[in-house]
Amino acid sequence: MNKYDRLDEITKLVNKRGSVRTNEIVEDLNVSDMTVRRDLAELEEKGVLTKIHGGARSNSAFQYKEMSHQEKHTRFIEEKRFIAKNAVDLIEDGDTIFLGPGTTVQKLAEEINHYSLTIITNCLPVFNILIKKQTLHFRVYLLGGEMRDLTEAFVGEMTNQLLSQLRFSKMFFSSNGVKDGLAMTSSIEEAYTQQIALSHSLEKYLLIDSSKIGKDDFSSFCELRELNAVLTDNNDLEKKEKIESYVEVIS
């Protein structure tokens, strides 16, 4: 096996398992310990993985360092726009909708152009887009509370009390990662607020680009089996198939 094939195999191993020990790579690829260590060092330099004691962990599978709203805003723009265009087709005049935080949901807000809707959100950037479209029949509400600087989403007791009194025909939301049939986020507070909204929504749709599939994060907040559908892109059919074992996928 040449070096480039070996690097490719190690990348596949660590991304599939999340983390892998050096001796496992030695056995799987039938190469020396020293060769594996050199390969891991090279892959770490390329940003593919992070070396840990006795092995390495995937930089694709772990998402514990949360990116800011601005950082996320510049990533996978076309994929998010593709997802948003599919999501807007699920919205009907007369719906009462909850929109969660996230840049993919923000793209959906840009696409919404209906005559008669009631939209509630706890995300300031989403609200700022929609409030410009408000009319007598197109009503937009922002739930207040404590704002998280990273995501510009309102959370906490005040937000949750307001949310607990409301009911929605549809909810559109995103997550930082999806793994083992669970949607995950970096904040317990955001997770709890999302759970309340989910429990008060008749139809529930998760919007995620395929880079998030297989990624772990700090707090899980819903099972994919509880959702009506997951909307994603077509960049990685293998990842999409993983989701299809739990829920309908729209792409």
Curated annotation (Swiss-Prot):
Residues 20-39 bind DNA. InterPro entries: Carb_Metab_HTH_regulators, DeoR-like_C, DeoR_HTH, NagB/RpiA_transferase-like, Tscrpt_reg_HTH_DeoR_CS, WH-like_DNA-bd_sf, WH_DNA-bd_sf. Keywords: DNA-binding, Lactose metabolism, Repressor, Transcription, Transcription regulation. Residues 3-58 form the HTH deoR-type domain. GO terms for biological process: lactose metabolic process. It holds the Pfam family DeoRC. One of its GO terms (molecular function) is DNA binding. The keyword ATP-binding does not apply. Repressor of the lactose catabolism operon. Galactose-6-phosphate is the inducer. PANTHER family: GLYCEROL-3-PHOSPHATE REGULON REPRESSOR, HTH-TYPE TRANSCRIPTIONAL REGULATOR SRLR-RELATED. This is Lactose phosphotransferase system repressor.
